[in-house]
C-alpha cells in the first residue's frame, strides 16, 4: 500500500510542461481529486462507519427488546383482562335474569378498552422503531459527510502550497499578457 501511495505522490511532482503527468490545477482535475478523496473516505471511514452502525444496531435491538417487554406486559394485561372477563361472565350467568344487557355492555367495553390499549402499545413500538431507524440514518449521513469534508480539506491543504499558487498566478498573468497582444 505504501508503494502505491509513493507512486501517486511521485507522479504528482512530474513537470507538467507538455508531457504525461498529473495536472495539479484544482479546477481542471476535479474528478481525480474527487476519486482520491472518495478513496480515502471509503478506506478510512469504513471502520468508523461499521462502528457507528454496530452501535446503532445495538440501540435499535435494545429498543426492540424494550418494545417486546412492553408487548409482553400488554399480553399479561390482556390475560388479566380475560380472567376478569371470565369472572364477569360467571357473574353474568348468576345475574342473567336481572341484568343481562348491562353485563354484556360491560363485557364489550372491557374487550374494546383492552384492544385499544394493545393497539396503542403496538403503535408506540412501531413509532419508536421508525424514529430510532431515522435517527441512525441521519447520524450516519452526517458522520460520512463530515469525514468526506475533512478528507477533502486535508487533501486540498496538502496539495496547495505557496509555490503552486505563485506558478498558477504567473501562468495566468502570462496567458492574459498573450491575450492582450
From Swiss-Prot:
Compartments (UniProt record): Plastid, Chloroplast thylakoid membrane
Main location: plastid
This protein's GO CC annotations: chloroplast thylakoid membrane; proton-transporting ATP synthase complex
Protein name: ATP synthase subunit b, chloroplastic
Species assigned in the record: Lemna minor
Gene Ontology MF term list: proton-transporting ATP synthase activity, rotational mechanism
This protein's record includes keyword Ribonucleoprotein: no
Coiled coil location: none
Family label: Belongs to the ATPase B chain family.
Other facts noted in the record for this chain: In plastids the F-type ATPase is also known as CF(1)CF(0).
Domain of life: Eukaryota
Primary role: F(1)F(0) ATP synthase produces ATP from ADP in the presence of a proton or sodium gradient. F-type ATPases consist of two structural domains, F(1) containing the extramembraneous catalytic core and F(0) containing the membrane proton channel, linked together by a central stalk and a peripheral stalk. During catalysis, ATP synthesis in the catalytic domain of F(1) is coupled via a rotary mechanism of the central stalk subunits to proton translocation. Component of the F(0) channel, it forms part of the peripheral stalk, linking F(1) to F(0).
